[in-house]
UniProtKB/Swiss-Prot annotation:
GO terms for molecular function: dTDP-glucose 4,6-dehydratase activity. Belongs to the NAD(P)-dependent epimerase/dehydratase family. It comes from the Bacteria. This is Uncharacterized protein YtbQ. InterPro entries: Epimerase_deHydtase, Lipid_A_modif_metabolic_enz, NAD(P)-bd_dom_sf. Pfam families: Epimerase.
């Protein structure tokens, strides 16, 4: 059974993955705070390299970088910039470097659709077609810029250290999908459902592709991003989309 380390496992995505992957993998969660789920828990600050290097198990097969921090979208806030760069720049580099130094073969990075959010409004592509990873990355906020920076850090480690890196530009993942679908129209197009979240991360862990960037969104009607490469290259198999979720609710399933 492969050993998977989830860095930043106390967030929404981390908890969903820790619970969903544990039947197929030996899962360990690394976070500043103790993880109280079924997976093993390691407390460490990912922005402290020496601490990270000591605490990551050397026999880890894959690291999932889900590190996150609450953010404000204020380009003029220096304190906010420094907080974000600690997580989305410094810690991203540290995780890649630790993986390379410890001989860990794979890192899956939870990137964001905000890397290209200039091309999307209210869940609709402004390009007249689905947005692809070939489109030049342009973001409306520092969060998207730093997520792209982390993707590029991973690419450098792939080139220089042969670290396998898969970047997943994630759509919308929430704990309560139905409430959010009723409250936010955009989510009907941008949701990555819980089954599809597990499906694409499993595909990223298991793929033989050494490096790639993919959009991670369910096969929702009118979705703004293309999942063609994720399906064809990673073997991503979407299980349920927003139309099906809403239909199940309507029919009382």
């Amino acid at each position: 059974m492969k050993k998977v380390l989830i860095a930043g496992g106390n967030g929404v995505i981390g908890r969903l993955l820790a619970e969903g992957l544990i039947s197929d993998y030996e899962v360990t969660v690394l976070d500043k705070d103790h993880f109280d789920g079924k997976a093993s828990s390691i407390q460490a600050d990912a922005a402290n390299y020496e601490e990270l290097l000591k605490k990551i198990p050397k026999d880890t097969d894959a690291i999932l970088n889900l590190l996150a921090v609450k953010i404000k979208y204020d380009i003029m806030d220096i304190a906010e910039f420094e907080k974000m760069t600690d997580v989305f720049y410094r810690a991203s580099y540290y995780l890649c470097r630790a993986a390379a130094e410890l001989g860990i073969q794979k890192l899956v990075f939870a990137s964001s659709n905000h890397v290209t959010d200039v091309y999307e409004k209210d869940g609709r592509s402004l390009l007249g077609r689905e947005i692809t990873t070939s489109d030049y990355p342009l973001s409306k906020n520092l969060y998207g810029v730093l997520k792209l920076t982390s993707e590029q850090i991973g690419h450098l480690f792939y080139l220089e250290n042969k670290l396998s890196v898969i970047n997943l530009r994630i759509g919308t993942v929430v704990t309560d999908e139905m409430d959010t679908l009723h409250e936010k129209e955009r989510t009907k197009k941008t949701l990555l459902s819980h089954p599809d979240l597990l499906s694409i991360f499993k595909a990223a862990i298991e793929t033989n592709i050494r490096y790639g960037t993919y959009y991670a969104v369910s096969d929702n009607p009118g979705r703004p991003w293309s999942i063609e490469s994720a399906v064809n290259e990673l073997g991503f198999s979407p299980q349920i989309n927003t139309a099906e979720l809403l239909n199940e609710e309507e029919n009382g399933a």
